[in-house]
């Protein structure tokens, strides 16, 4: 009797695993992220710490590994050393014997013009020879600067089922926020009918006047189709060599098979039933996304055993809380406190502390994000602040109560969040000479 082969559909795990193994992920991690102000003075945005122990890029890398996409290139450019060091320390567990790898792709002026990466499309174009060496069937292009959990196997399966040339992950957002992204329109089959990068007046979704459909900067390309389009774009003098500004609008206008994938169909374990995706590109957004993690049931579940967020694990002792006097009690309430922290007769409320933070007696920290290796002296009172790593907060410093006074020394956002860095305190830990 002849055995019939298994039917390969997008519900078949074998079908999806074959797709993920035949996919190369390329993470664009070379951006500065200027809206994060001083947090990116000495590191690229994907290397900015997040969530108590992670870096922003860990979420995209974890999505790749958890989805079964384990051939990964990371494209770097702006002040990449912190990012490179983190990936080398925390992401060396992939096994090359099974064709698993993370390959760092720094800007090397690989074109005949001898230029650095000029745009997102150019960053991929300059690595075409490396992509061809790995010979993937599909290329998954990702940003390294957003916080979300996504099963990339689902967008890959949908891409193949629709016989698409390009599939773009999309999300509904309030129309007033859409001008910071690529804005799309689709037909009933979710084929993309228009695409505008960061329009001044975003078009709302038909029937939903308060919302717009935006690109998440997540693209699935058929590999050979991608190579052809990048070569064509490179030869266009008028192009800025960017996917959102040039390549995608041109593909939509030429009637290529460009489809949209709804993020809610691949978002992993939504706590509130609403897909979680955060662009932490401003100090306000960064502060809020971190503080949200201290709530009882945050929208982003970091305790999900089925979809762990991988990172470099420092060898640190547990957090310690000392002194229990009425006026000097070491305690943290509604907060996240990481390894190596010592709360010595101080009070922490609704705050997130990264590793190795030391807070001395009679100090109070409220609604704040404290990055690693910060020391806070006695009688300090910090409220609604982000403190950069390595800061030495002096005795008696009070921040967060008088914005006009705070602005004389620190950066204060429109929403009243204060950013404190060592340089602002006169502690020059970053220097060239």
UniProtKB/Swiss-Prot annotation:
The protein's name: Glucose-1-phosphate adenylyltransferase
UniProt-listed Pfam families: Hexapep_GlmU (PF24894), NTP_transferase (PF00483)
Function: Involved in the biosynthesis of ADP-glucose, a building block required for the elongation reactions to produce glycogen. Catalyzes the reaction between ATP and alpha-D-glucose 1-phosphate (G1P) to produce pyrophosphate and ADP-Glc.
Keyword list, A-Z: ATP-binding, Carbohydrate metabolism, Glycogen biosynthesis, Glycogen metabolism, Nucleotide-binding, Nucleotidyltransferase, Transferase
One Gene Ontology term from the biological process aspect of the record: glycogen biosynthetic process
Gene3D superfamilies the record matches: Hexapeptide repeat proteins (2.160.10.10), Spore Coat Polysaccharide Biosynthesis Protein SpsA, Chain A (3.90.550.10)
Reaction it catalyzes: alpha-D-glucose 1-phosphate + ATP + H(+) = ADP-alpha-D-glucose + diphosphate
Pathway linked to the protein: Glycan biosynthesis; glycogen biosynthesis
Entry similarity comment: Belongs to the bacterial/plant glucose-1-phosphate adenylyltransferase family.
Main EC class the enzyme belongs to: transferase
Disulfide bonds: none
EC number: 2.7.7.27
Top-level taxon: Bacteria
């Amino acid at each position: 009797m002849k055995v019939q082969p298994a039917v390969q559909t997008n519900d078949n795990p074998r079908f999806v695993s074959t797709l993920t193994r035949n996919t190369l992920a390329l993470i664009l991690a070379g951006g500065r992220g200027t809206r994060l102000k001083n947090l990116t003075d000495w590191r690229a945005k994907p290397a900015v710490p997040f969530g108590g122990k992670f870096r922003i890029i860990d979420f995209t890398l974890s999505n790749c590994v958890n989805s079964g996409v384990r051939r990964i290139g990371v494209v770097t450019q702006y002040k990449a050393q912190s990012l490179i060091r983190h990936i080398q320390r925390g992401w060396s567990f992939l096994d090359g014997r099974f064709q698993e790898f993370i390959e760092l792709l720094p800007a090397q002026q690989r074109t005949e013009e001898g230029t650095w990466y000029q745009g997102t499309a150019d960053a991929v174009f300059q690595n075409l020879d490396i992509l061809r060496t790995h010979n993937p069937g599909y290329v998954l292009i990702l940003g390294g600067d957003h916080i979300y959990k996504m099963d990339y196997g689902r967008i890959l399966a949908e891409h193949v089922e629709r016989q698409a040339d390009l599939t773009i992950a999309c999300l509904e957002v309030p129309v007033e926020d859409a001008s910071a992204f690529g804005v799309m329109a689709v037909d009933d089959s979710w084929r993309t009918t228009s695409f505008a990068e960061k329009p001044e007046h975003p078009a709302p979704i038909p029937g939903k006047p308060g919302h717009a459909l935006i690109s998440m900067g997540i693209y699935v390309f058929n590999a050979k189709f991608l190579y052809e389009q990048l070569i064509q774009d490179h030869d266009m003098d008028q192009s800025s060599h960017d996917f959102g500004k040039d390549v995608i609008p041109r593909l939509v206008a030429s009637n290529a098979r460009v489809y949209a994938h709804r993020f809610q169909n691949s978002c992993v374990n939504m706590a509130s039933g609403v897909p979680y995706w955060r662009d932490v590109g401003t100090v306000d957004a960064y502060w809020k996304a971190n503080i949200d993690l201290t709530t009882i049931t945050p929208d982003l579940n970091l305790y999900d055993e089925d979809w762990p967020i991988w990172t470099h694990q420092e060898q640190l002792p547990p957090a310690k809380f000392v002194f229990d006097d009425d006026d000097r009690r070491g305690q943290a309430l509604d907060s996240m406190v990481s390894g190596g922290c010592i709360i010595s007769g101080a009070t922490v409320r609704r705050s997130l502390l990264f590793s190795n933070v030391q807070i001395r007696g009679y100090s109070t920290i409220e609604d704040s994000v404290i990055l690693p290796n910060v020391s806070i002296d006695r009688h300090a009172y910090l409220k609604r602040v982000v403190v950069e790593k390595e800061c030495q907060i002096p005795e008696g410093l009070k921040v967060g109560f008088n914005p006009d006074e705070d602005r004389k020394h620190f950066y204060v956002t429109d929403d009243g969040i204060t950013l404190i860095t060592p340089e602002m305190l006169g502690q020059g830990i970053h220097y060239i000479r």
